[in-house]
Amino acid sequence: TGCSGTGRGGDTASTDGASAGFAADATIGVALPDKTSENWVLAGGLFEDGLKAAGFTGDVQYAPASNTVAEQQNQISAMITNGAKVIVIGAKDGKQLGTQLQQAADAGVKIIAYDRLIENTPNVDFYVAFDNYKVGELQGQALLDGLAARSGHGAPWNIELFSGSPDDANSAVFFNGAMSVLQPKIDDGT
């Protein structure tokens, strides 16, 4: 996946950094929540490779899994101080980055919330994620399909639902998507 645009003359912009409004070797920061999830490690590698291929200097950092959000806050502040033009953030806790995002706005740094919504601040320029509600719907349907496949083996079923981490704003969206599929079945007892 990549980004492109059109130049003033309508020509497709090239992939070098200068066409994006930054020097070809501008630093783009990427702050990810941890290295304990294969998804975040894969994303970090893809960011590193993509930024390098586009001519940018990538500064990809992971907050330690055992640490509080303070380490990610410090990493983001350092990226701003060190001159990052854009910072992509997979938030460790999307409700606790307001100070750093205000610092970014004051410095003219663009912020892209990646995969996890950043709340409690107006200083997010872009949000890039899957359709998390649809993901929840698919999770709910997968549960129903799995239970239907076992319907001859002791139905009805008792299920216990979990909505995810309270510091992940996407948890409620996943849960609501799943419940849009599950609640009608719960209500009618099927």
Question: Model-flagged regions — what are they?
Answer:
Residues 3-190:
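A residue-level marker of the well-folded mature domains of exported/periplasmic proteins
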